[in-house]
């Protein structure tokens, strides 16, 4: 059971041949992030808490089921970024990230009967190139509303790759799910054939 509405996460699981169903948890992520900001500036901890909260909420509706929750945080220069609400927000985010290195931290949590049974957090570092504003406007025109579907206003697996100079870290983590670690856990627990 996947406690996420992310099409990227669902696509990764499908392409890996993992059977699952989706049940999206109703979580006010902004409220959680706001309250956590006062407690910690650790994006890995916030991603883990959000992932667990989603999985626990869905687990309550599915007794006995293994529920996977995931979340991702983007931080740059001690600032947390969210999915942009519109083109203007996407443009502002990309300008703030231009010619800088930012970190994407992805957390995945497994919950059964309301209890966390496993978790994993992984981070990747991405450096954007010093693109021109002319390029940026063309990118936003071509990408369209897709820029609103992911934190950072890009999809590295597509057109967004043109924004980058270098990437350090696991590709699946960048897409929002540390898939290799998750599959290892699923094999160890009899959910996948070893």
Swiss-Prot record:
It is found in: Cytoplasm. It catalyses: a ribonucleoside 5'-triphosphate + H2O = a ribonucleoside 5'-phosphate + diphosphate + H(+); a 2'-deoxyribonucleoside 5'-triphosphate + H2O = a 2'-deoxyribonucleoside 5'-phosphate + diphosphate + H(+). It is an enzyme of class 3 (hydrolase). Keywords: Cytoplasm, Hydrolase, Nucleotide metabolism. InterPro entries: ITPase-like_fam, Maf-like. Nucleoside triphosphate pyrophosphatase. May have a dual role in cell division arrest and in preventing the incorporation of modified nucleotides into cellular nucleic acids. This is Nucleoside triphosphate pyrophosphatase. It comes from Paramagnetospirillum magneticum (strain ATCC 700264 / AMB-1) (Magnetospirillum magneticum).
């Amino acid at each position: 059971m996947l406690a996420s509405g992310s099409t990227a996460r669902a696509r990764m699981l499908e392409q890996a041949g993992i059977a699952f169903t989706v049940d999206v948890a109703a979580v006010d992520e902004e409220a959680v992030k706001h309250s956590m900001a006062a407690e910690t500036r650790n994006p890995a901890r916030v991603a883990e808490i959000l992932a667990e909260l989603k999985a626990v909420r869905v687990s309550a509706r599915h007794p006995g089921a293994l529920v996977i929750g995931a979340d991702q945080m983007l931080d740059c220069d001690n600032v947390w970024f969210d999915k942009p609400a519109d083109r203007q927000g996407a443009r502002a985010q990309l300008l703030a990230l231009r010619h800088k290195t930012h970190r994407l931290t992805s957390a995945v949590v497994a919950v059964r009967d309301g209890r966390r049974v496993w978790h994993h957090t992984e981070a990747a570092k991405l450096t954007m190139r010093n693109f021109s504003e002319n390029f940026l406007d063309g990118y936003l025109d071509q990408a369209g509303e897709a820029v609103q579907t992911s934190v950072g206003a890009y999809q590295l697996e597509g057109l967004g790759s043109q924004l980058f100079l270098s990437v350090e870290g696991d590709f699946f983590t960048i897409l929002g799910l540390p898939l290799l670690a998750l599959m290892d856990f699923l094999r160890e627990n009899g959910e996948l054939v070893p």
